[in-house]
Amino acid sequence: MTSVAVIVPFRVQVGQTREEELDEFLPYMKSYLQNEKNFNNITRFHIYVIKQYGTYGDDLKKFNRGLLLNIGFSLTNDLYNIFIFHDVDLLPSDSLSEYYSMYPKKPIHIAGCWQRYNGNRNYFGGIVSFDRKCFNIINGFPNDFWGWGGEDDALLNRCIGNKIKPYKIEDGGVLDIENGIGYELEEKLQVLRDNKEFKCLDKWERIEEDRLNWRENGLRQIHDRFKILSFETINDHTMIEVEIE
């Protein structure tokens, strides 16, 4: 039986439109996954939104995508056999639907076809599918990338270091709904140059450190790093708000 957990990291951030994106993402993805269920490609699915407490700009903690995704996996890993780590601002085209029900014998980079990054062979972010075994082998994501960027590079290094070669999808389409427009790469980079506080400022140093300490910094080390503040299920999605350290 094929059961799918879609795990979405989420944080309200000044100057961004994440709440509006979530309002568009949830009905789209529920319909998208329900179609797969109707065709008997999956037996059940659920979307888990792991919301980081606070609003950056009002507190000092930056967004920590990797830690949120590790938390989402840890709360769902006994319930499903496919885990899709999914950014809230990306909507897949119909041509990608088969990869949402395909058992990932090796990780599947569903967003590998995203036009913004399709010239970057090392890009491993956006939408990635894992099975339980592979995600545990690599100890999940690193927990110490605060701000935008780097945790997906470290995730790819963890796969390669464990002789796990991801399958990159190169045909298909992904719609970027960030801020209501489809940013091109240079536009996205300019936003980050203008708002350096959004970025992980020590990204490259942390990527190199992670090559050595990935066994001690990841999925197996999260249990004292978060506290659940609220848990609300509405139909096929659950919002879990967490305070993280």
What is the role of each PLM region?
Residues T2-V8, M29, H46-Y48, G72:
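Hydrophobic targeting segments
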Residues A5-R18:
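A conserved hydrophobic helix/loop-capping motif in glycosyltransferases and polysaccharide synthases
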Residues F25, D144-G147, D153-E245:
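C-terminal catalytic/acceptor-binding lobe
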Residues L79-S93:
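Short beta-strand-to-loop acidic/aromatic patch adjacent to the donor-nucleotide binding site
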Residues N38-Y80, Q115:
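Active-site-proximal specificity loops/subdomain of glycosyltransferases
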Residues D94-Y117:
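Conserved donor-nucleotide/metal-binding helix-loop-beta segment in metal-dependent transferases, i.e.
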Residues C113-F130, I137, G147:
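A recurrent flexible, glycine/aromatic-enriched loop bordering the glycosyltransferase active site
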Residues Q13, E21-I42:
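Short, acidic, metal-binding catalytic loop of nucleotide-sugar glycosyltransferases
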